[in-house]
Amino acid sequence: MLKQIQKFLKLEAASGILLLVSALLAMIFANTDLNQLYFSFLQTEVAIKFGAFSIDKPLLMWVNDGFMAVFFILVGMEVKRELFEGSLSSYQKAIFPAVAALGGMVVPALVYWFINQNHPEYQSGWAIPMATDIAFALGIVALLSKQVPPALKVFLLALAIIDDLGAIIVIALFFSHEMSMQALTIASIAIVILVAMNRYKVTGLINYAIIGTILWASVLKSGVHATLAGVIIGFCIPLRGKNGEAPLHHLEHALAPWCSFAILPLFAFSNAGVSLEGMSLDKLASPLPLGVALGLIIGKPVGVFLFSYVAVLLGIAKVPEGINLKQIFAIAVLCGIGFTMSMFIAGLAFGEEEASENMLALARLGILMGTFVSAIIGYFLLKITTKPSLMKAA
């Protein structure tokens, strides 16, 4: 179990560096003479036709709706594995990170709402600061990996996985559009087939790829966000086959490098490019970016730590052995690294109409500010609270 976590941490740490480079490249492209090339490339129309069925979308939407669906297959499999075999497989293991994750979703949303309560045009962005970017957060932890207790890494992993699950629920409930009953019917049939294949332990992954593609296309056409199809596919991959095979582990192992080193960096490059032309300090301090940034910088750590602390006081949960509340607070600050997941939700909240483009740019600036500040403060807090001398004193 520990070896698997160490491999995962190494992978995500490398991915975090690549994400940072991708975001910096996007900002350079968006704010130099290359900006026209960058934005026109992202708006290039790409169409797929199969008889009467067709999908015609800009390249940016293929990244956000298509490639990110593959990432959410991985998320679905990770959540399933942790629920059945890992750090969320019992009430005692799950309750502490679950309560922390709940606080990390509720309080940032409240901070954003409080700052934007008099601006109805911005209020659809309330979910943006709820998210945590696991790759970036683990990248920071990896910089101090020799002195960070294993239990603290497991806590962050469990919290982030529950956080992802919360983001999935929010996307399903609040960011779906007008429904197409025909497409939903096809999607429902595909889900029934996937569940049946899981029930009868069908291990041929090509079968899941075929039915999964049908599910993704029908969900895309239905008005529900297409990435949710990825989560469903991930959940339907069997943990064990009839002859002891482990299809979920094999697919997770195969997809993880592609998601870490291709899909997430591509998503970051496609979504982090914000033109600063016409931006002023007044705009940067306006309610939308301020609500997002403060939701991540203040709301996340306060929510994660406060809910954890109250749960311990009430006897609902116990602090995992080998770590202390000071270290929990350092991890809570790192949870303010929203980046890719926050960018994803911002695209859903403000990305559909042309009139929303300015709001989306402001939201992205808020995410970049919140992520940067949370990463810097979180790093130094984690470094201080995990010093061997302090850990012995605790």
Swiss-Prot record:
Task: Give the transmembrane region(s).
Answer: 11-31, 59-79, 95-115, 124-144, 155-175, 177-197, 203-220, 254-274, 296-316, 328-348, 365-385
Question: GO biological process annotations for this chain's record?
Answer: regulation of pH
Q: Which GO terms describe its molecular function?
A: sodium:proton antiporter activity
Q: Which InterPro entries match?
A: Na/H_antiporter_dom_sf (IPR023171), NhaA (IPR004670)
Where is this chain's protein located in or outside the cell?
A: Cell inner membrane
Coiled-coil intervals: none
A single Gene Ontology CC annotation of this entry is:
plasma membrane
Its keywords, alphabetically, are:
Antiport, Cell inner membrane, Cell membrane, Ion transport, Membrane, Sodium, Sodium transport, Transmembrane, Transmembrane helix, Transport
Instruction: Give the reaction(s) catalysed.
Output: Na(+)(in) + 2 H(+)(out) = Na(+)(out) + 2 H(+)(in)
Annotated Pfam families: Na_H_antiport_1
The superkingdom listed in its UniProt entry is Bacteria
- Protein topology in the membrane: Multi-pass membrane protein
Protein purpose: Na(+)/H(+) antiporter that extrudes sodium in exchange for external protons.
> Of which family is this protein a member?
Belongs to the NhaA Na(+)/H(+) (TC 2.A.33) antiporter family.
Name of this protein: Na(+)/H(+) antiporter NhaA
Which taxonomic lineage does the organism of this UniProt entry have? Bacteria, Pseudomonadati, Pseudomonadota, Gammaproteobacteria, Pasteurellales
Gene behind the chain: nhaA
